[in-house]
Every structure is written in C-alpha cells, then in structure tokens.
Amino acid sequence: MNEIHKTAIISPKAEIDKEVVIGPYCIIGDNVKIGRGTRLINHVQIEGITEIGQNCTIFPFTTIGFPPQDIKYKGEPTGVKIGNNNTIREYVTIHRASVAGDGWTVIGDSNFIMAYVHIAHDCKIGNSVIMANLATLAGHVQVEDFAFIGGLVAIHQFTRIGAYAMIGGFSGVGQDVPPFTMASGPRAKLYGLNSVGLKRRGFSDETINILKKAYKILFRDKLQLKEAIDKVKKELPQIPEIIHLLEFIEANKRGICR
C-alpha cells in the first residue's frame, strides 16, 4: 500500500506503483511514472515525461523532469528515465532532454548522486556511478559504469567519462576521460591508472598490470595516439578491458585527456 502525505500534490494522471512513499509537500506531474518501493522524502517535485524505477530514494528539494536549459527547446515531448536502486540527495536537478538527441536524459541503476548535483539535458549515466556534491554535467555528457566524479567538478557538454574512471574534486573536464584512469585539474589531465578503485572492484593483479602497461604506451611514451593504439594492439593481450579502453579512445570526438 502506498504511503502518501496529505500535503502532497499528485496528478490523477500520474502512475504510482505499489509501496511508494511520497512525503510532505511533494509535487508529481501528469506524465510521471514511479516504480514500486521508491521513496520521496519531502519537497520533491517531478514534472514532464519522467519514469523512475523501483527502490529509489529521493531527498528534499530535488527537481526532476523540468525543461532543459537550452534556448532552442520549445516544449517538445522529451523526458527523463531513471532506473532502480538510485539514491538522489538534496537539491539535485535532473533536466529532461532537448530535441538534439534521442529525447531522453537517462540514469541507470544503483547510482549515488550527492547533494546539489546538476545533470543536464540528454546526459547518459550508467550504473553504480558516484557523483559527489556540486558536480555539474553539461548537456549530452556520457558517464560509464562505476565512474567516480568528485565534488565541484564541471564537465563540458558532449564529454565522455569512461568506466571506472575517477575525476578529482574541483576539476574542469573538457575532453574525454578514458576508462580505468584518474584525471584532475582545472583543465583536467591524466594522473595514472585508478589502481585502488580497480582493486576495490575486484580486478585481478594480472588485469591491472596489463592496463598499467597500456596506460604507459598510450599516455606516457609520447607517441602519436594512432601509433600508441597500434602498439597496444600488437604488444598486449586483448583482454576485454583493453578492448574497451581502445574502442573508447578511438570513438572520441572531443579529444582525450592525456
């Protein structure tokens, strides 16, 4: 049975699943869907075409599904999709998509999004991502699984953050950050492999050592990027992590942090 506070304002057109808790002064718009077991603490406002999965917890003064901060947007039917088991802390803003992408801002499963984070239109967030306080993602940013984004980080539009990457606090990121690496700085640069994070996630010593060798060839041997990629393909075992790393780099459009 749902637990809905008497001060909450919920559109009769909204689709609220079973066992949802909606606390005081929450506002839920017409085209909102909320999955089983999700909890809105209080003062949460959800608008637009927004789908929220199961067992999410959303804290006070978070807003989801409002129009994108894009002057080209004229009210087209775009939306937000949020998966299961996400924690979204106080004052987070998650905007619906613009018309320049596929029409959705997407957040996957099991993410931890800390207070005052901004996720702009058309962003694609994977699974098990951690975003610390006041991290800001511009439009069309992509963040792969298990990435960590530090506090007060600003990420330029269309930039990609690779899986298991770590971005240090106060950084400005304007180029793609490769998977498994660490980046930091006002114009973010790479500072090595995220070895500690990889060990915590259960990567074997053998895999980490292969990634370290790839990192050295790609980012420290002062080779042209294509030459470095060819050398990694020729000299190192093509384990899944190496394949993903190289495919990510080869797909870049904004350049790669080095």
Curated annotation (Swiss-Prot):
HAMAP family: LpxA (MF_00387)
Name used for this protein in its record: Acyl-[acyl-carrier-protein]--UDP-N-acetylglucosamine O-acyltransferase
Listed GO MF terms: acyl-[acyl-carrier-protein]-UDP-N-acetylglucosamine O-acyltransferase activity
EC number: 2.3.1.129
SUPFAM superfamilies: Trimeric LpxA-like enzymes
GO BP terms: lipid A biosynthetic process
Gene3D superfamilies: Hexapeptide repeat proteins, Udp N-acetylglucosamine O-acyltransferase, C-terminal domain
Subcellular location: Cytoplasm
GO CC annotation terms, alphabetical: cytoplasm; membrane
Catalytic activity: a (3R)-hydroxyacyl-[ACP] + UDP-N-acetyl-alpha-D-glucosamine = a UDP-3-O-[(3R)-3-hydroxyacyl]-N-acetyl-alpha-D-glucosamine + holo-[ACP]
